Amino acid sequence: MHVAVIGSGYVGLVAGACLAETGNDVICVDKDAEKIRRLQQNEIPIYEPGLEPMVRRNQEEGRLTFTTDLPAAVRAARVVFIAVGTPPGEDGSADLQHVLAVAREIGRNMNDSKVVVTKSTVPVGTAEKVRAAVRCETQQPFAVCSNPEFLKEGAAIEDFMKPDRVVIGVDDEEARAVMGELYAPFTRQGGNRVLFMDIASAEVTKYAANAMLATRISFMNQMARFCELVGADVNNVRLGIGSDQRIGRAFLYPGPGYGGSCFPKDVKAIIHTADALGLSLDVLKAVEDVNEAQKRVVLHKTIKYLGKDLSGKSVGIWGLAFKAETDDMRESPTIPLINGLLETGARVQTHDPKATDSARAIFGDRVMYCADPYSAAHGADALLVMTEWLVYRNPDFERVRKLLRRPLLIDGRNLYDPDRMTALGFEYHGIGRSRR
């Protein structure tokens, strides 16, 4: 099938590469000429495991091309995905100007029947706005679908190729058949993995899914703080409640708060949409409040044990990205942590396997970027673990302890066993793991 993907950012690039992998002829479009030039040279602007070889392979085999020529891509396609950004406004609402501008451009270049698919994360009602924008520019027949993505950064290729489910909002039988054919190769492992539904429900599903996951994270982070007060270990509590099949163990890990490009933005957007309709989503507002407070927990622990004035003190940080297996620093809990440390006068030395360039764009030369974890620990008065990269899970702890000026280890991801760390000579403090 001939497919155009408008927007070659994270979602568009992954979708385009995976659709090409199953034999479709895919054209990925972006207005950024330099990005397109780099993609044509197989230079991937983001870190995502498995993406670079997939892009390279499909370009070499002629199924995947990159261009700035949106009109030509639209004319060549049967299905056109809109995968441009929807950045949040100051009030938390999703900015649809790029989505609707692309929709109008699609309409102006429509030469036969097309299926126009919103892949971007958009609020309920957007598909109707897209339909109106396209209709203003063409008399050609077309259908509009909603096909939200459910990709986890760091596992996006696996998520797309072997999805838990594919949600498709559609109100046209021909479009339903086209989308079913397009996704058939990804759902042959059995089960009813393609969920066709009305468009509004598909649009809500994306926001509801991310809001639920964010809620679980904030719930466990609040339980972690409670555990510290009563002398319990949140890890034991996590195992105890996660063993209940009604609850399950996914997304029950306490930490420094959620971040990234999805959860913060999507929770704000659904709250804003509901507020505009006269409904206050009080649970999700509490989820946001808990998360903002949680982002300060590691900083507060550092100040508690090192003092309010950190002038002359060095703090090592392992992990900058908001999660492992990505270079994404958007809304990372490490950002307010580092800003807080700098405000108190600390010298900050950091390490991350992939996110150093992203961090440098934020902090410039105000922090030190180390080539390996041990350099970040060298001479530090405290070591803070902020991202659950594999490289941090089992280092040479004796070497780390000797490198530290003071063996203060604040484990923001609960990677380590408290008793073992204490036996190794560390002053260990986790999240929700009382040492009383």
Q: Which residues does each predicted region cover?
A:
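Structural/interface elements that position substrates and couple domains in central-metabolism enzymes
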Residues: M1-R436
